[in-house]
A protein has these predicted regions:
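Glycine-rich beta-alpha loop segments
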Residues: 27-165, 172
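Acidic/glycine-enriched connector segments
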Residues: 125, 146-206
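Arginine/glycine-rich "motif VI" loop of SF2 helicases in the C-terminal RecA-like domain
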Residues: 222-227
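Cysteine-centered motifs
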Residues: 15-17
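Glycine-rich anion-binding loop/nest that anchors nucleotide
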Residues: 201-220
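Low-complexity, intrinsically disordered or signal/transmembrane-proximal segments
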Residues: 20-22
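Intrinsic low-complexity, disordered N-terminal segments enriched in polar/charged/small residues
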Residues: 6-9
Length: 227
């Protein structure tokens, strides 16, 4: 089964921004209702960005900083803050890793980690990886064994990304991608799924179990809801 992700995810960044974010307020000029303390905070955030040397998407980064500082008063549970901390760190690293390859189309392959190399579907995944690279695509998989390794074998290390998940009972990345710079490991499934969909021009499902079904239905849900 092959289907592309929604255009809204690929072209708009696939993110939902709460109404009246900092960048939206700056664009619309809607600052009249802001308390003086908030305006001072925003001024200091802008100074911090300038001290850092500026860069891309300064208004959006300012909004992230402002919301991060609000965690000091709004969220007492350390574990909750660590979820945000880890997710932000993982997403920033993943976006940086994919950025040099933004001009290359990519296909994500989902399938069983338990498929043995002697199985027909394993060889089919190898053949698919080889053919899709010849068509100008790169291949993204979950970096594990089975179908994921087969897709990487066909595509070759130079044309492969590995989006791994850290689990205590699973083995590490497959040998094709294990030592490559395009391998990344995630703590959370939700950030991992976002990266799969965000950077894919198409998704391919090979036979698999609950994990493959979860990934496939996640993609279908995002398509159906326009996310």
């Amino acid at each position: 089964m092959v289907f592309p992700p929604p255009l809204s995810m690929r072209k708009s960044g696939g993110c939902f921004c709460p109404p009246q974010s900092y960048s939206a307020r700056m664009i619309k000029g809607n600052r009249a209702a802001k308390p003086a303390a908030d305006l001072e905070l925003q001024r200091r955030i802008q100074e911090l960005i300038a001290f850092k040397g500026g860069g891309h998407n300064e208004n959006e980064v300012a909004d992230i900083i402002e919301n991060a500082l609000k965690l000091l008063a709004d969220v007492e549970e350390t574990g909750d803050v660590r979820v945000i901390q880890t997710a932000l760190r993982e997403l920033r690293y993943a976006f940086r890793l994919f950025a040099p390859y933004a001009h290359v189309r990519k296909v994500t392959i989902f399938g069983s980690a338990r498929t043995q190399s002697g199985k027909v579907e394993y060889q089919q995944a190898v053949d698919f990886g080889r053919k899709i690279v010849k068509a100008g695509f790169m291949v993204i998989t979950g970096a594990g064994p089975g179908i994921m390794q087969a897709g990487h074998e066909g595509a070759g290390t130079a044309n492969s990304f590995g989006v791994n998940i850290r689990l205590p009972w699973e083995q590490g990345a497959n040998p094709v991608i294990a030592e490559d710079k395009k391998l990344m490991s995630f703590k959370y499934f939700f950030t991992r799924k976002l990266i799969f969909i965000r950077h894919s021009d198409a998704i391919v499902l090979f036979p698999g179990g609950f994990g493959t079904l979860d990934e496939g239905y996640e993609a279908l849900t995002l398509m159906q809801t326009g996310k």
